[in-house]
Amino acid sequence: LDITFSEQKPSTDTVAANPDGTPFRNADGSLLFRPGGHGALIENLNDLDADVVFVKTVDNVCPDRLKADTVTYKQVLAGLLVSLQARAFAYLEELEAGDVSEERLHEMLQFVEKDLHCHSDAAEALEGLELLDYLYCRLNRPMRGCGMVRNVGEPGGGPFLAYNPDGSVSLQILESSQIDMNDPSKKALFEQGTHFN
């Protein structure tokens, strides 16, 4: 294993805020910047040349007594990811070679929907080259996985179905800051979640 560390880049820092939402200023009047959070790590990920990357931030490092469980579940997640990735790569090779039967295209569509959890009603009606293009776009992209634990009231995001602009529905992790907590129905959905990341 090649284990390295990547620190968040200062260019992704965000302005610190006071409790009332106004920018926090240092004693000299300058703005205080702080690391921007998980989303800011995307830039770091783009710089990596690796098949599998585990992101572990300082707020989710576990004590030594729990490390064995952490290693076990990382191995499970990596095994699942590599297995899904191998199927996706095999399908991509077939799509690139061309001459894929409609039956095989629909098998690939089932994989995208059932195993990659990305559903589109519009895709169900696609055939031939349109379906091939749709599948290629869905398969030719990075894969993400996320460990989940029971929600016991700790802060964190949770698994939600995201309704995307293209009409597809995909499984996504949403943080509380991405949920309109002023909408009682959305707040209730977030609070009733059984698991979080």
Task: Give, region by region, the residue ranges found by the protein language model.
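Domain-scale recognition of functional cores that engage charged ligands
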Residues: 1-152, 166, 178
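Short aromatic-glycine-enriched beta-strand elements
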Residues: 156-161
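Short, surface-exposed loop/turn microsegments at beta-strand edges and helix-strand junctions
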Residues: 164-168, 190-193
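A short macromolecule-binding patch
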Residues: 169-177
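Short nucleic-acid-contacting surface segments enriched for D/E, G, S/T with interspersed K/R
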Residues: 185-197
